[in-house]
């Protein structure tokens, strides 16, 4: 039997990958974190001339995706950047193809692996659905240990549990 592995076209990883990656102007950055934290991350990235959407909720729904699409389709972002955990990356995975834009995924935690897969988890009518489409694959993933520095032990434990949950929740 033949097997196929699909991975992002570009994977920048390592210490300071975040700062050494070049980001397009007029990018839409989608995140779940408050501005005090996202501002620090965006400064580390060196990104300039961007739009920010920080209203993504944990375990997002298709309604969250539609809010991003309706709010930004006329602003014509050059690219969508999912910065954060699986929630922000999953919103970008679904929204970017709808807007006919490329996507850059930057995980700030570990556990979901969302930056590397063709899977997207969203709620439809209150029920979580695991979707798999090639269009959900990132055009670029940026993985930097910067986000692990100072991560509280409880967050690390939660991320390990999340990795286990992600491995099993797709089975209905």
Predicted segments, located by residue:
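ATP/NTP phosphate-donor binding region
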Residues: 1-79
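Structural motif
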Residues: 10, 26-28, 78-81, 102-107, ...
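Catalytic cores of large soluble enzymes that bind and process phosphate-bearing ligands
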Residues: 13, 57-60, 84, 152, ...
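Alpha-helical scaffold segments in soluble metabolic enzymes
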Residues: 20-23, 67, 71, 94, ...
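Short glycine/serine/threonine-rich phosphate/pyrophosphate-binding segments
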Residues: 21, 36-39, 62, 87-94, ...
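A short, small-residue-rich loop immediately preceding and capping a beta-strand
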Residues: 72-108
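A glycine/threonine-rich phosphate-anchoring loop and its flanking beta-alpha core
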Residues: 98-172
């Amino acid at each position: 039997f033949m097997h196929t592995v699909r991975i992002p076209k570009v994977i920048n990883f390592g210490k300071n990958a975040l700062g050494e990656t070049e980001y397009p102007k007029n990018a839409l950055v989608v995140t779940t974190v408050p501005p005090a934290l996202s501002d620090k991350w965006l400064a580390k990235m060196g990104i300039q001339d961007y739009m920010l959407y920080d209203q993504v909720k944990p375990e997002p729904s298709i309604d969250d995706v539609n809010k991003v699409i309706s709010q930004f389709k006329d602003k014509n972002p050059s690219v969508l950047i999912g910065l954060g955990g699986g929630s922000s990356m999953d919103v970008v995975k679904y929204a970017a193809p709808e807007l006919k834009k490329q996507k850059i995924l930057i995980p700030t935690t570990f556990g979901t692996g969302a930056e590397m897969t063709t899977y997207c988890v969203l709620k439809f009518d209150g029920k979580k659905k695991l979707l798999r489409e090639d269009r959900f694959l990132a055009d670029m993933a940026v993985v930097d240990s910067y986000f692990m520095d100072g991560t509280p032990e409880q967050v690390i434990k939660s991320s390990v549990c999340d990795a286990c949950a992600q491995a099993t929740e797709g089975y209905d």
